[in-house]
């Protein structure tokens, strides 16, 4: 069963009793079936009354009892920004009675009346459209003050307000876009963390007002459906009625700050809890901004999420981001290590291939050198053999003793020259077996040179040294009386070989001095 609110007596029956009717016909005495009890109706803003508007009276007035809002500051404050009006009505002027001021918080329009001269003047006054479209009467006085405020003074006041909130409370004012939806943007910023979700907040608020129309309609003088349809527009300003609805909807108190460190008004929800309130700041009596506490997370509080902890999502996201970053970094490092290992292997392969190529080229050069050297050696041996044959005729007339004494002076020179010119290290590495001194014939030397075509640099130093030593030794050391003809041939061959060695050394020095083009 629904208990309807009490009807108010017509204005004509008690023209000066609006103040009394405000207390006797308070809307908080109205109750609804199945609804939760309300501690107070939507509060109205406290402001010093204007003498010109104190005598005004609006028809069909419904005023909440005074003192229903928690006020924490002094000074004039408007409850909303101007909004478009969808209905109009005529008002009559009454020069007496301060209680005739229409102070209801839900008035969607207001007609300012011009009083005639004299405090007791009465009569009909023409209506003006100066205040048309405002949500309540307390916007008129503050709006007039704002228009005459110096811009520099207003800027200093805004700066002081932000600095005071930051130093004393640690709060930060977040600027909202000034497009008529600033109140819903401020609430969306603190509930959803994104002011662009103001349309969702507005839709939920209007739906909540429609579901509780039997309560909130008592504070709206115009048709409640028309009021809701107008408030659904994105460019329509919000008011304290919407603040009360959002405080109940999100079950979070709504605190309003205006140029002070303490809230001038607080809207409470149905149930008291320890949730962080929704804080908004009111600027120039026309704009709302969001006031946030950077040290305490409040996003998501009031949405009815089970087991929701403010800030836990950010921590989880941070941990997930750190874990993902570490995994990505580890994978990147492993990939780089593999790339470096691959480069190292490829480098080793390239080095090995280059070394093998250079070694092969060096081997080819050595083969070419070895192929050219046998021809030079055979030519030298043939010239040495011819010289030896011509020298045999001269030595044939001599006795062995004379030949030995004649040939002996030459041997020290050979031995000394051999000692002065030692063999090169490269030739020592390729030494073969020295030829036997017992068979020193020219034919044997030629055949031996032909057989060693692949290795022509056979060192003859051991054989020459042996022959030189044998020339200095006495024949009696070997059990002989005198040297035979073989000894003469051996000495001739030794001289030929010495000549060949000198030629080879000169050619080697010539090749070393000139660049190797092969």
Swiss-Prot record:
GO terms for molecular function: cysteine-type deubiquitinase activity; K63-linked deubiquitinase activity. Its EC number is 3.4.19.12. It holds the Pfam family OTU. Residues 282-287 are annotated as: His-loop. SUPFAM superfamilies: Cysteine proteinases. One of its GO terms (biological process) is proteolysis. Keywords: Hydrolase, Protease, Thiol protease, Ubl conjugation pathway. Belongs to the peptidase C85 family. This is OTU domain-containing protein 5-B. It comes from Xenopus laevis. The gene is otud5-b.
């Amino acid at each position: 069963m629904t208990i309807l609110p009490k009807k108010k007596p017509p204005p004509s029956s008690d023209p000066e009793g609006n103040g009394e009717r405000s207390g006797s016909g308070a809307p908080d005495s109205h109750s609804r079936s199945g609804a939760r009890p309300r501690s107070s109706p939507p509060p109205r803003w406290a402001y010093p009354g204007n003498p010109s508007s104190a005598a005004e009276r609006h028809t069909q007035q419904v005023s909440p009892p005074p003192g229903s809002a928690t006020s924490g500051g002094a000074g004039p404050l408007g409850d909303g920004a101007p909004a478009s009006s969808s209905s109009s009505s005529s008002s009559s002027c009454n020069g007496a009675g301060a209680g005739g001021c229409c102070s209801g918080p839900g008035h969607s329009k207001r007609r300012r009346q011009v009083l005639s001269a004299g405090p007791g003047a009465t009569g009909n006054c023409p209506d003006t459209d100066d205040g048309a479209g405002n949500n309540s009467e307390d916007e008129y006085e503050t709006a007039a003050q704002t228009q005459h405020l110096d811009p520099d003074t207003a800027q200093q006041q805004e700066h002081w307000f932000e600095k005071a909130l930051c130093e004393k409370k640690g709060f930060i004012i977040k600027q909202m876009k000034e497009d008529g939806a600033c109140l819903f943007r401020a609430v969306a910023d603190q509930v959803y963390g994104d002011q662009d979700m103001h349309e969702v907040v507005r839709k939920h608020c209007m739906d909540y007002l429609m579901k509780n129309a039997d309560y909130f309609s008592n504070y709206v003088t115009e048709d409640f459906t028309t009021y809701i349809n107008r408030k659904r527009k994105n460019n329509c300003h919000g008011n304290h009625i919407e603040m009360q609805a959002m405080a109940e909807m999100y079950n979070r108190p709504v605190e309003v700050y205006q140029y002070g460190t303490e809230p001038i008004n607080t809207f409470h929800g149905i149930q008291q809890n320890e949730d962080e309130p929704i804080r908004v700041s009111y600027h120039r009596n026309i704009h709302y901004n969001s006031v946030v506490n950077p040290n305490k997370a409040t996003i998501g509080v009031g949405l009815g999420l089970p087991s929701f902890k403010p800030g836990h999502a950010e921590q989880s996201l941070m941990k997930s981001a750190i874990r993902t970053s570490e995994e990505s970094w580890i994978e990147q490092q492993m990939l780089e290590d593999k790339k470096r290992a691959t480069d190292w292997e490829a480098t080793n392969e390239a080095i090995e291939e280059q070394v093998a190529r250079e070694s092969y080229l060096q081997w080819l050069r050595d083969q070419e050198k070895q192929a050219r050297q046998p021809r030079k050696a055979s030519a030298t041996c043939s010239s040495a053999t011819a010289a030896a044959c011509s020298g045999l005729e001269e030595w044939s007339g001599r006795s062995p003793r004379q030949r030995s004494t004649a040939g002996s002076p030459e041997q020290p020179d050979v031995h000394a020259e051999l000692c002065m010119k030692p063999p090169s290290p490269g030739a020592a590495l390729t030494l073969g077996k020295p030829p036997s001194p017992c068979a020193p014939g020219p034919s044997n030397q030629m055949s031996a040179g032909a057989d060693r075509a692949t290795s022509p640099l056979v060192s003859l130093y051991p054989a020459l040294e042996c022959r030189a030593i044998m020339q200095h030794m006495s024949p009696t050391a070997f059990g002989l009386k005198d040297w035979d003809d073989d000894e003469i041939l051996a000495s001739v061959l030794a001289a030929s070989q010495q000549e060949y060695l000198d030629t080879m050394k000169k050619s080697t020095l010539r090749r070393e001095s000139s660049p190797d083009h092969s």
